[in-house]
Amino acid sequence: MFQRTESIDDIGLSRILQTDKSNTISSLTKVICTIGVKSRTVEELSKLLEAGMSVARFDFSWGSHEYHTETLMNLRQAMKNTKILCATMLDTCGSEVAVRLAAEDVSSFDKDAPKTPLVMKEGNKVVLSVCNHEEDQKNMVVTSEFFPVVNCDSLCEIVSVGDSIFIGQYLFTGSETSSVYLTVDSIDIENKQVVCTCNNDALMRGVLLTVQISNIGEKLPTLSRNDEHDIVNWGVKNNVDFISLSFTNSAEDVRKCRRILDEHKSFHTKICAKIERASALKNIDEIIEEADGVIISRGNLGTELPPEKVFILQKMILSRCNVAGKHAIVARLVDTMAEAPRPTRAEATDVANGVLDGADALLLGAETLRGNFASETVAMVRKICREAERFYDHESFYNAQISQRKIEAGEVSQAEALASSAVRAGTKVGAKLIVV
């Protein structure tokens, strides 16, 4: 890991307090936005583009192909109106386990959400029941004691007595009042039910809940049949730029996704491996080598790891991606801006430190999916990124990267030598852009 900031003594207080007047200049660190109900109109997408969105993320954990296609058409119109280009990312559902609180299509989160939240009480029994058939889902009744799991037929086989289960609102923001921890008491294989004890009080809101099961490891596939269908019939069809491969566990998961893309001549589409489970960490080096980029999903990863371990794993993964020359993306940043116009001081510092750690892009989830301040969030994150970049020691970082590459791979390749020469020349003349 390398020193990436200038010496504090060399910066000077006057420079720190200097007002940044370059509001029209975009940050070098890119901003990825998850598009949802509140941000999918042409008007809102135009605001996101003008605020600094670089990549639009289409999350296939919910919504039909027709729904996402309509959103994509709106994005293209917004790009035409603003004359600002934007890449597209398809995020697979992967092995995510879900609970629906309403039978309707979850494309319209607010409209279909139950009017009153489910009240969870510590010590109460909760039954998780497999409910995979469409007819059963239409007739299901959800209560604080009964949760239907809609997309995991093998639930009873992958859990064990004593396992911890976390349930939170889709793209949960970490609030202890809107998520619940359960402990598995017994498993009824015949009736496909798991009986649990609730460990905390909570108010469960929204239409879609996600379920995180401890020790699940590689028991569920990274790419389901639905994921393959989404990639081929929507991603390839619409020429997406990136695939976000949810719950990547190994390099083979990436290779499988690449084979699907290659079979359909989608050679340009890049694959970003999403690190969401602790089990993926033992394969992190081979995943980085195989993927085009890595997304550190701190939300899901944080439910499986002690909080004090997340920061050092972030620094380690970002550093290894930088040395390997792979895209490094950090998720879960300014959760409070889903409901507030400003981030907390801790969140603002977290964003800046992500930039200084070497993140190439920052991924916004609930803030732009269902948040009330989507474009304001993008503008704020971009401002923090730009401020952090003012004090980023690019030259020292560059020299450290070259040295590290020589240590790990011997002499640099011809392509790397050409690229490094271009960077040196650009730095010396103060170039704003390098055109390849």
Q: Across the structure, where does each feature detected by a protein language model lie?
A:
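Non-catalytic helical/linker scaffolds that mediate oligomerization, partner binding
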Residues: M1-V436
